[in-house]
């Protein structure tokens, strides 16, 4: 694949189709020059695996996504040589997002503009003070694809987003929203977090957490915003196909199972349907048509193999069960603790297919006992190979395990306070927060519960709980304090290990409150060490109450606090 050229030039449709044809011939062919059956179009195979395809690259969309990277580079580094050269030639008085093709444009510039148009579709403003964002023209709603809200007839012609905020810039002006924006977009705007301390608007890529352009996310966007009708996925249950790619087995077995579910095997029934043959009779039993379910499960030969294998799931040999039900039962065995059950059923399918081809094309009969023995041998060899590779990998470069928290709640340093917080959310109700405050001896000095705003993700819910607990602790005059939660993603964001464009305003507010403390740290702990705060967050508040402070230990967290105290003392 000419990736280097595709980074700079927009390939013609004819070249893309020619390359697609070469790739398709390689995929469906057997390595020789003979003609081969293309069971599905390349467009259908190019669908993501989660949508039932095989995830091959659709070259035109991939080409545009690669070209978009050049536009992003110019936006990120406007003073680099390439950016300065193009600006001087094509857009001296504006920026690349508003540049036009102009006269006598080079082929490279025409290509870059096609990538620029894709970047435009995925750019979104994160509203800060709103002074740079035009409410009716700039893309600032976090929807797919990003867009401005739809305005009503009463709305002024030109409105900056700052005019939609209240006087303190801490929330939206609901009166203006209801009057100027159509109702279906009002709720979307109200769910956008604003921060009073924000001093500028931020532009980022909507389709990644970091807000940074990636070819992968841009390719997905190009695939899902095309003017052409999207291709139909190949036949078969998409949810069951997703299970295929999670199987711990050989890649060739995964693709074989995909072809089985998609109806892309050369069974007699399929060949007759495509008018390649008129005889669909099973060559083993000569009693029924050779359908996929008959070949692998219902034929006397296949039933003998499955009975000899002793697979404990009765669905496998149940003649009334569907093909999807049988395969689902086999896939579920792949998570079995027994190696025998994990691998053998999948290799039995493979060996039944191989023995069928030997019979049809070489006129050699392989007994069911031999087929079963070969399947067991394949399964054992594959598992032994995997074990050897894992042992080698662990010895040479051990993979870091999942992050482990401390075994018990820990007291803060002398002179510091620790506040454990947690959030609880539901789809249609405002999120809730719970927090527990303890001193450097582990003594309880307070706890709180509060109801916040409606949040759209669990991450937003956790950050809101942190903000509420910070506000409360600051109001009580604490100077040096640790805030400890159980969300690893939030911990990475707070400590600068991973940026997150989607919660940027929440992060702005956290950092603004952090500056008010003399000393402030953000810590992570395992969920079991955060049980008191978790229990408070899940506790329902009485109707009409949005905040409760507990001077004494609430009954709902008494046992968990006692356990924390006991373990930390030990």
Listing of model-derived features with the role each one plays in the protein:
Residues 1-570:
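A helix-boundary/hinge signal
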